[in-house]
A protein has these predicted regions:
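Extracellular disulfide-bonded cysteine-rich modules/repeats
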Residues: 129-139
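Residues that act as N-cap/strand-start positions at coil-to-secondary-structure junctions
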Residues: 37, 79-81, 92, 119, ...
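Surface-exposed loop/turn positions
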Residues: 20, 36, 72, 91-94, ...
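Intrinsic low-complexity, repeat-rich intrinsically disordered segments enriched
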Residues: 1-71, 103, 120-122
Length: 151
């Protein structure tokens, strides 16, 4: 990592390049940003923790044609007891919050090969009208809802 800014006889502000690993560093008063992810064994924040949000219209009636959703909070419209949404692929710890904003039940499908609660792999569960559910991936194929919804 080259030193790029001269300060007296020393240099400061080393330039970090792609692939650089920093171990045991403390960031003070700065920002860490990434287009993909930042990981650590523990993350403490003195400010807020913000989730991304989206609004999606429910579509289709099967896992194959349901509207895809992502991490964070998704407000779902257009549920009519036949339409649904599809979760992203399960990755341990992945968190999704779904708010059914419609006056009808919403089908919630896992990604292909995944399961939700104790139901059969690739089967949906039903989210009641105007309710919410927090879903957390336990491993690479299993989602659990909080509260645990009957399946």
């Amino acid at each position: 990592m080259p030193n790029t800014k001269p300060v007296g006889v020393a240099f400061s502000d080393p330039e970090l390049v792609s692939g650089t690993t920093i171990t045991g560093a403390t960031i003070s008063g700065g920002t860490i940003s990434s287009a993909t992810s930042v990981s650590a064994s523990d993350i403490t924040t003195t400010g807020g923790l913000y989730l991304k949000t989206a609004t999606v219209a429910a579509t289709g009636s099967t896992q194959a044609d349901a509207a895809s959703i992502s991490d964070g909070l998704t407000l779902v419209s257009a549920a009519d007891a036949t339409k649904g949404v599809k979760l992203p692929a399960a990755v341990a710890g992945r968190t999704v919050i779904i708010k059914n904003g419609a006056n009808a039940v919403l089908k919630v499908w896992p990604a292909t090969g995944d399961g939700i609660n104790a139901i059969t792999v690739d089967s949906n569960y039903v989210l009641a009208a105007n309710t919410s559910s927090l879903l957390i991936a336990y491993d690479a194929t299993t989602w659990y809802s909080v509260p645990l919804l009957a399946s």
